[in-house]
From Swiss-Prot:
Coiled coil: none annotated. It comes from the Bacteria. It catalyses: GTP + 4 H2O = 2,5-diamino-6-hydroxy-4-(5-phosphoribosylamino)-pyrimidine + formate + 2 phosphate + 3 H(+). Keywords: GTP-binding, Hydrolase, Metal-binding, Nucleotide-binding, Riboflavin biosynthesis, Zinc. This is GTP cyclohydrolase-2. GO terms for biological process: riboflavin biosynthetic process. Gene3D superfamilies: GTP cyclohydrolase II. GO terms for molecular function: GTP binding; GTP cyclohydrolase II activity; zinc ion binding. Pathway: Cofactor biosynthesis; riboflavin biosynthesis; 5-amino-6-(D-ribitylamino)uracil from GTP: step 1/4. It holds the Pfam family GTP_cyclohydro2. It comes from Shewanella woodyi (strain ATCC 51908 / MS32). GO terms for cellular component: cytosol. The keyword Hydrolase applies.
Amino acid sequence: MSIKYVASSTLPTPWGVFDMHGFEDTETGKEHVALTFGVLDAETPTLGRIHSECLTGDALFSLRCDCGFQLQTAMQNIAEAGQGFILYLRQEGRGIGLLNKIRAYELQDQGANTVEANEKLGFAADMRKYDMILPMMEKIGIKQVSLMTNNPRKVKAMQELGIEVVQRIPLQVGKNRYNEAYLKTKSTELGHMMSEHHFSTDGES
């Protein structure tokens, strides 16, 4: 994989002004983004998140998943901490692409869960890769991470690339009546680490 840094700019947001760094995978043509906030120090743990693209959740405010809620909460947490980063990876639909994701949603509307839908379409449950994050991390100057995630695969991916994950910070937000079954499937079949309280019927997270 060949990741090339392209350019940087400021990105004003409701939570503060981030810096946006653009990268291109010259083999696939995919474009990835790193957002940074504040002054980053390679020698101290930095609050951060690896976030895979979710057009429906991030931009269209879908309640079928928790992605948009996680992205916004991560940005807010970083702004409140005064420094941090988000790697925004173009891996829509856990790596199957937008149109296949819509096909999977159609199967879910007919009763399949998120894993079953992917498999019925001939895909693995999660096809994402994370090898592109190392050159992105090197460019923004981060070696130690306090990682906001419920996904143990992201922790493992960073560790295998030689990035020290000092701690994992749960990011349990956005549960609602449309995505509760989806969140349960992520926990029971994909190994995401979520507390039982997150699935209680007493209110919504």
